[in-house]
Amino acid sequence: MARVAVVTGGTRGIGEAISLALKNAGYTVAANYAGNDDRAKAFTDATGIKAYKWDVADFDACVAGIKKIESELGPVDIIVNNAGITRDATMKKMNRQAWDEVLDTNLGGCYNMCKAAWDGMLDRKFGRIVNIGSINGQAGQYGQVNYAAAKSGIHGFTKALGQEGAKSGITVNAIAPGYIDA
């Protein structure tokens, strides 16, 4: 039986490419999305990859999403935390809601997804987690203090969680791409 991989934000952009690459490599892929139902249906129709809708910023929704995928496809052994949003504004113009939404989705989503699948990975002594950061988490970007903070946080989160998982066969890595034309 093929290992099950979940890709958040997996129906478009970088996530779509990751979902397809994993499918082509022989994995059973579940693509998470939060918004566009028509786009998700078109993705599933074109790729044969099932799309599951929930907001990664919602912890309970992540737990329910992992449970649903595991009941339909089998144990989740791979998570690619790709879901992300922007709410760009300079600090002078940024409101607290824009800050919270970006941190809750981009960084909180990584925690929520990892926490939802962690115990199963520990029990099976196997897991692969890839967190998608950004070059802007390392270098910063004008008008993106919220996004840069979230993506920088992913780097520290990845390092710490990787240390926790190593003794149990769980690897945790991050990728920090630059600008992408999607």
Question: What is each residue range found by the language model?
Answer:
Residues A25-A40:
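Conserved glycine-rich Rossmann-like NAD(P)H-binding loop of the short-chain dehydrogenase/reductase
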Residues S134:
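Residue(s) in the substrate-gating loop at a strand-loop-helix junction
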Residues D119, Q163-E164:
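Alpha-helical segment proximal to the catalytic Tyr-Lys
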Residues K92, A139-V145, K167-S168:
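Active-site loop immediately N-terminal to the catalytic Tyr-X3-Lys motif
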Residues T11-R12:
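Conserved glycine-rich cofactor-binding loop
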